[in-house]
Amino acid sequence: MSIPFSNTHYRIPQGFGNLLEGLTREILREQPDNIPAFAAAYFENLLEKREKTNFDPAEWGAKVDDRFYNNHAFKDEPPEKSETQKIQPEKVAIEKETMPQETVKEKETQVSFVEEPTEEPQKEEEEEEDEEDLEGLLVREGMQDAAVKIQAVFRGHKTRKEYLKKRDSTDETADENNE
């Protein structure tokens, strides 16, 4: 409940926006007559998927959104790559053969999120080197900007000094001519 003319703003919980986007996408795709019942069924299905696969799309989406605000959240392993949640390719192939067609599509979609880690230490080292290079570049750019400002201030000071000398000399010559 909001208070009229109040400056308070409530924060939307992480992952809630992603859940609503997913629900909205499915509503637009299916065009159901009874939207609340469809939403209830959608969320029940989502809970079942989460319990079966130990993969929470809301948590994953929150981390993806958080990437833009806090890149340190992605230094650790994402939830879909942790040891307890890896899906073996053999199990997926067996499940595809034994499951009905609709479930196979759902499983294929879920598998698309799982990737095998490939030489992550090398990538981390490259990322650290890139960050160091970027920091060095930013420091150099900052020093260059500071040097430009110092030069501009000095040139301005020098120009004002010359202008004052010229003005004083023209004033002296004008005074001599008037006398």
Curated annotation (Swiss-Prot):
InterPro entries (UniProt xref): cAMP_dep_PK_reg_su_I/II_a/b, DD_CABYR_SP17, IQ_motif_EF-hand-BS, Sp17
Topological category with respect to the lipid bilayer: Peripheral membrane protein
GO terms under biological process: binding of sperm to zona pellucida
Name of the gene this protein is made from: SPA17
One cellular component (GO) term of this entry: membrane
Keyword Membrane set for record: yes
Region: Disordered, residue numbers: 72-138, 159-179
Biased composition (Acidic residues): 116-135
Main location: membrane
MF (Gene Ontology): calmodulin binding
Organism: Monodelphis domestica (Gray short-tailed opossum)
Keyword Membrane part of the UniProt annotation: yes
Subunit description: Homodimer. May interact with ROPN1.
Stated name of the protein: Sperm surface protein Sp17
Expression by tissue: Testis- and sperm-specific.
CDD domains, sorted: DD_CABYR_SP17, IQCD
Keyword annotations from UniProtKB, A to Z: Membrane
Task performed by this protein: Sperm surface zona pellucida binding protein. Helps to bind spermatozoa to the zona pellucida with high affinity. Might function in binding zona pellucida and carbohydrates.
Subcellular locations according to the entry: Membrane
Comp. bias regions, Basic and acidic residues: 72-109, 161-170
